[in-house]
From Swiss-Prot:
Localization terms from the record: Cell inner membrane
Membrane association type: Multi-pass membrane protein
GO molecular-function term, one example from the UniProt record: symporter activity
Name of the molecule in the record: Probable potassium transport system protein Kup 3
InterPro entries (alphabetical): K+_transporter, K_trans_C, K_trans_N, Kup
Length: 629
């Protein structure tokens, strides 16, 4: 994964920037780029369907255009991209940045975690509605093919999830060119419609949208549910900042993605103005019949790319949450040596697949799925706006009035969309919200339980001098070996070392007490990753620093010490780690009891520390203890 710090050194004429811009098209814009497949159709259906009048068509198009301008172009491209955590973007990175520098930690963390949990909830729907809406184009090709839509969509998604463990580096190289061709195609198709009915360009005037919104009462409010679908992928513009940097994302948005989307939505509006039927997918009706099948194939590929971006994003966010201590350790597999972002987390992959397939089978069509789509991502955007306001005021040092005016505009827009989407709660919106609440609860319970264990494990600090005196008095034998004792907190002598000497009456002549320190920044500078100090008598104290985007690998880190001339043999190291068995006894309240039981379940199913830190199993010695909570 390229670092933003390096990307920003390139200017617009640099080939690296052009290459990154092309790659960004394949990762960042999949969701927002495939929204034309279902957005305008959904808006017209919410407005009453049938044959809409000019006011409805122009008002709908105007609302879509200005939603893309305010949310995507202004909020995310112009503001959010400028607030990064050492080059990384996204709501968890923003939460970590603010909680590190400011005092309102509980509130910031609560908002950030809820936003992240909502992204998981939304991530189950995006692949389902995207792929389903693309395959539904077959119904226009031949009505008899409608019976094959669901099986084809299910087959595509099962295949997509099944290949994740193999990595997608090879086919991923084609994502950028394919999405570039996709945007050019939808832009040209839309332009054809605009040329045939140029009056539709007047929809760029926001008056059309505002008049339609405020003159139609409840209908104008409900229609915002459909309008919002055009911006559901906007959060990815910020979340993928660390992959590409600010310049490539801005260049591709304003240079290709944004104008192509505008032309396509206007083209669909022009088609409906001419009297096209709204019963079928309006997007496909823009295409000449001879090219319909190639467009269906291209649309399907584009939605697969959009789904891949969602899956990859879920893996990345899960790793961030693990490193920040909000989720238990899970097995992370690096699927490619070419990029650090190429990872696979099996549990996340299969749970996401089951949820996505369940939604497709349960709802059966993109039209029905639209009822469940939008509520979670609109809530996420609301959370981002809250954190954005804090960042403008506290980090940029804007006065509270200026910060309030800017963030207030975004807040009004986001809150309006969220309120409108709440009306879909009983029609399916409860699904992503329920998933988000479950995930948020899991993160809270894990973090709370982990802190409880840390308190229970708190031992009286034993100094190095007193430890050396005790082993000298007891006649402990020193052997010519190297031992590494892993600990999660800084202390002179960890309990595992005391227990080892007490039980075995022997100690290696080279002892490294290694504290694993997870930072609230994405990447640790190479020079700061390992700090080591010799305290005497063959005992070293070391601190291994890892950012929340990094995967700890202790043997690789210790190889650096060996290369620097330290007298250790990496092949002759024994690693000592603690292994806690947690059990619940005599909980005062029923709720407290079940929360503790859930934590114990998560703890028992977490990836063993030795696997997570890539320790060679034949060289690991676990020291167990029981802890009651």
């Amino acid at each position: 994964m390229p670092s933003t710090r390096n990307i920003e050194k390139h200017n617009d004429s640099n080939p690296t920037l052009r290459a990154l811009s092309l790659s960004a098209l394949g990762i960042v814009y999949g969701d927002i780029g495939t929204s034309p497949l279902y957005t305008f159709k959904t808006v017209i259906l919410l407005a009453g369907g049938g044959t809409p009048d000019v006011t409805t068509i122009m008002g709908s198009a105007s609302l879509i255009i200005w939603t893309l301008i305010i949310i995507a172009s202004v909020k995310y491209i112009c503001f959010a991209l400028r607030i990064d955590n050492d080059g990384e973007g996204g709501i968890l990175a923003l939460m970590s940045l603010l909680s590190l520098k400011l005092k309102q930690k509980p509130f910031i963390i609560a908002v950030g975690l809820m936003g992240a949990a909502l992204i998981y909830g939304d991530g189950t729907i995006t692949p389902a509605i995207s792929v389903l809406s693309a395959v539904e184009g077959l119904e226009i090709l031949s009505p008899s093919l409608k019976y094959y839509v669901l099986p084809i969509a299910i087959t595509i998604l099962i295949t997509l999830f099944a290949i994740q463990s193999k990595g997608t580096t090879t086919i991923g190289k084609a994502f950028g060119p394919v999405m570039a061709f996709w945007f050019l195609t939808i832009g040209i198709l839309g332009a054809r419609g605009v040329i045939q009915h140029p009056f539709v360009l007047a929809a760029i005037n926001p008056v059309y949208g505002l008049n339609f919104l405020f003159s139609n009462g409840a209908t104008g409010f409900f229609i915002l549910c459909g309008v919002f679908l055009c911006a559901t992928g906007a959060e990815a513009l910020y979340a993928d900042l660390g992959h590409f940097g600010t310049a490539p994302i801005r260049c591709t948005w304003f240079g290709l993605a944004f104008p192509s989307l505008i032309f396509n939505y206007l083209g669909q509006a022009a088609l409906v103005l001419e009297g096209a039927s709204t019963e079928h997918n309006i997007f496909y009706m823009l295409c000449p019949s001879d090219f319909l099948l190639p467009l269906i194939i291209l649309s399907t590929v584009a939605t697969i790319i959009a789904s891949q971006a969602i899956i990859t994003g879920a893996f990345s966010m899960t790793r961030q949450a693990m490193q920040l201590g909000w989720l238990p350790r899970l097995r992370v597999t690096q699927t490619s040596s070419e990029g650090y972002g190429q990872i696979y987390i099996g549990v996340v992959n299969w749970l996401l697949m089951l949820a996505t397939l369940g939604l497709i089978i349960g709802f059966g069509s993109s039209e029905k799925l639209a009822a469940a789509y939008g509520i979670a991502v609109s809530a996420t955007m609301l959370c981002t706006t809250v954190l954005l306001f804090i960042a403008l005021h506290k980090l940029w040092k804007w006065n509270i009035i200026t910060s309030g005016l800017v963030a207030g505009l975004f807040m009004i827009v986001d809150a309006s969309f969220f309120a409108a989407n709440l009306t879909k709660f009983i029609n399916g919106g409860y699904i992503p919200i329920t998933l988000a609440i479950i995930i948020y609860s899991m993160m809270y319970i894990w973090h709370k339980g982990y802190k409880t264990i840390a308190i229970k494990q708190k031992e009286k600090n034993i100094t190095v001098d007193s430890f050396l005196d005790s082993i000298q008095k007891e006649g402990v034998v020193r052997v010519s070996k190297t031992a590494v004792f892993l600990t999660s907190k800084e202390q002179d002598i960890p309990p595992t070392l005391v227990w080892h000497v007490k039980k075995n009456h022997v100690l290696q002549d080279k002892v490294i007490i290694l504290n694993i320190n997870n930072l609230s920044i994405p990447w640790c500078k190479p020079g700061d990753q390992l700090q080591i100090v010799e305290t005497g008598a063959g005992i070293w104290h070391a601190v291994a620093n890892y950012g929340f985007m990094e995967q700890p690998h202790i043997p690789k880190l210790l190889k650096k010490l060996e290369a620097q001339g330290y007298d250790i043999n990496i092949k002759d190291i024994t690693y000592y780690i603690g292994h806690e068995t947690i059990f619940v006894r005599n909980a005062r309240h029923t709720l407290s009891k079940y929360i503790k039981i859930l934590f114990v379940f998560m703890h028992r199913n977490a990836l063993p520390m030795s696997n997570y830190f890539h320790l060679p199993p034949e060289s690991v010695f676990e020291i167990g203890r029981q802890i009651e909570i």
